[in-house]
Amino acid sequence: MRIMGLDLGDKKIGVALSDPMGWTAQGLDVIAVKGPPEASVERISELVRQYGVGKIVVGLPRNMNGSFGPRAERARAFAGCLAGALNLPVELWDERMTTLEAEKLLIEADLSRARRRQVIDKMAAVLILQSFLDSQGRPRREAGGKNPGGPEEP
């Protein structure tokens, strides 16, 4: 089952998708937000059908002290809208620092400022989804198909 990860922004929604086994996240799309984020449900629904998505993970913005602000309430409302419209499980996932981490990775990759602007939301969605996938304890396979023995210990 594929899992979709979403990074909600005021102007864009970054979209990431897991591989069918749920081990790795890849960037998929950036959806321009026209009106309230709920207006983007149609495009997300198309992607869900196209890729056979069985679950959606929505980034939940939290303040550094763990409290929730207005953006978190928007994320909760959007997650509820998605769950109702798509009849899929939707999970909220802590997204603290993902945009900063995405920016750092893109700078290290020597992407121009213009190119970073184009892909940062997608990269943040990848980081949110990969964090979720890693938390699920799915064993990773080494090259050659060998299983190293289960989830990695921190």
Curated annotation (Swiss-Prot):
Where in or outside the cell it occurs: the entry states:
Cytoplasm
Q: What class of enzyme is it?
A: hydrolase
What keywords were assigned to this record?
Answer: Cytoplasm, Hydrolase, Nuclease, Ribosome biogenesis
Q: Name one GO cellular component term.
A: cytosol
Q: Which residues form a coiled coil?
A: none
Predominant location category: cytoplasm
Q: Name one GO biological process term.
A: rRNA 5'-end processing
- A Pfam family of the record is RuvX
Q: Which Gene3D superfamilies match?
A: YqgF/RNase H-like domain
* Domain of life (superkingdom): Bacteria
Which GO molecular-function terms appear in the entry?
nuclease activity
Q: What is its EC number?
A: 3.1.-.-
Identify the InterPro entries for this entry: RNaseH-like_sf (IPR012337), YqgF (IPR005227), YqgF/RNaseH-like_dom (IPR006641), YqgF/RNaseH-like_dom_sf (IPR037027)
Q: Which family does it belong to?
A: Belongs to the YqgF nuclease family.
Briefly, what is this protein's role? Could be a nuclease involved in processing of the 5'-end of pre-16S rRNA.
Spell out the protein name for this chain.
Putative pre-16S rRNA nuclease
